[in-house]
């Protein structure tokens, strides 16, 4: 959890620079990638984080360090964002990397907006999340810090390589395993889904069933969860025959599993406990 100083710094910086990032169009892709790279560098260099967040150090010195870090080939807006971040006060040194990552995700969202792919990316992230729920061994390897990042990325693309995912979806999925940031893989994907949902002004409701939902079921679910959340929702329907029947519904981090397979598993646990 970020301290008050960091929350203020992050909010003010993003409020100030979000319009420029939003208006950067196709360049938002490049900026987002550069900020992800910077996040990774900061995460692996505590001395650099300290140098960039030291309140006793002149801002000009910290900006000079940033210029040395990113070089002359970085996008001007990347430099402007980082210069703004180092000029602010942070509760913890690691919070500047969090802010850089937030800007990186914003860049990817604005690029998705620019290419009319925002909803598509949100749905694909939810599909990836749902698929990994049934692959515990794979997802554990995707956030295994003892496995080299290159190997984790290779594993990811062996999973999604044949999927017709948007380039933004693939980049975000790659970022989540390339730079773990002390998070479980599904935790990061859910965080990204939530950010896209807030960005679009609607919630993503992932419904897993053994057979496709009917139009009437989708309409009913939209009405129920729109009323529950207080804003529009999108139903992401996932068909998984292994659940046998019933529904598993996920909204953000909240999961309601009333599938037949879940009930059978619960029954098995109950029988074992009383045996």
Curated annotation (Swiss-Prot):
PANTHER family registered for this protein in UniProt: ATP SYNTHASE DELTA CHAIN
Domain of life: Bacteria
Gene: atpH
GO cellular component annotations of the record: plasma membrane; proton-transporting ATP synthase complex
Membrane topology: Peripheral membrane protein
Function: F(1)F(0) ATP synthase produces ATP from ADP in the presence of a proton or sodium gradient. F-type ATPases consist of two structural domains, F(1) containing the extramembraneous catalytic core and F(0) containing the membrane proton channel, linked together by a central stalk and a peripheral stalk. During catalysis, ATP synthesis in the catalytic domain of F(1) is coupled via a rotary mechanism of the central stalk subunits to proton translocation.
Segments passing through the bilayer: none
Native source species: Bifidobacterium adolescentis (strain ATCC 15703 / DSM 20083 / NCTC 11814 / E194a)
Similarity comment: Belongs to the ATPase delta chain family.
Intrachain disulfide bonds: none
Gene Ontology terms for molecular function: proton-transporting ATP synthase activity, rotational mechanism
Record's protein name: ATP synthase subunit delta
